[in-house]
Amino acid sequence: MSFLQDSSFFSMGMWSIGVGAFGAAALALLLANTDMFLSKPQKAALEYLEDIDLKTLEKEPRTFKAKELWEKNGAVIMAVRRPGCFLCRAEAADLMSLKPKLDELGVPLYAVVKEKVKREVEDFQPYFKGEIFLDEKKKFYGPERRKMMLMGLVRLGVWYNSFRAWKGGFSGNFEGEGFILGGVFVIGSGKQGVLLEHREKEFGDRVNLLSVLEAVKKIKPQTPASRQS
């Protein structure tokens, strides 16, 4: 009789542990899909961005200050998380859909990458047809770099973004560093400042294209008179 009581008590104990473990896992999954544990991006001041050193990707690279990109006409700049990532390729293609309108407004579209691995940049160019530059010190990914690692595997937004990119026919590889999150900037001409700063909160977090266009329309191209003032 005592054996049956012990067995029943043991079964109830194991059932309670199982329910508790399931509840803890469900709570962890729920919390992982909120923004509670995501690192908050630090806004990049114009002065910080202006002083970033970029390199061209030619055989004989030229180093220049990033402000050259937007000084006259402003610019839209994509900080690419990883060129070989199919999510990044989908983001780039999405942004490229604005190229005709940007050309009409006279605003250039650029991308920066944090490393040049094998042919990753060349293989990225079919999705992004603007000029691409190297940001070796990863300054466009700061001032405080944010990473997403294992949490990305359990976030529903990442799975949705992945499905959307896969359904769109995008594919990729695992070459290069892909944990440091990227973003998109719209920067006005001269000292007009940062008009839009989109920081990825998770893998495949695309910028709102209407927000990009709204910000671009605020750019005031520099004239000889405004450059002298």
Swiss-Prot record:
Superkingdom field: Eukaryota
Induction: Up-regulated on CSF1 treatment.
Active-site residues from the entry: 85, 88
Assigned keywords, A-Z: Antioxidant, Cytoplasm, Redox-active center, Secreted
Pfam family, one: AhpC-TSA_2
One Gene Ontology term, aspect cellular component: extracellular region
Positions in coiled-coil regions: none
General remark: The active site cysteines correspond to the redox-active cysteines of peroxiredoxins.
Reported function: Involved in redox regulation of the cell. Acts as an antioxidant. Inhibits TNFSF11-induced NFKB1 and JUN activation and osteoclast differentiation. May affect bone resorption and help to maintain bone mass. Acts as a negative regulator of macrophage-mediated inflammation by inhibiting macrophage production of inflammatory cytokines, probably through suppression of the MAPK signaling pathway.
The name this protein goes by in its record: Peroxiredoxin-like 2A
Species of the source: Rattus norvegicus (Rat)
Gene that this sequence comes from: Prxl2a
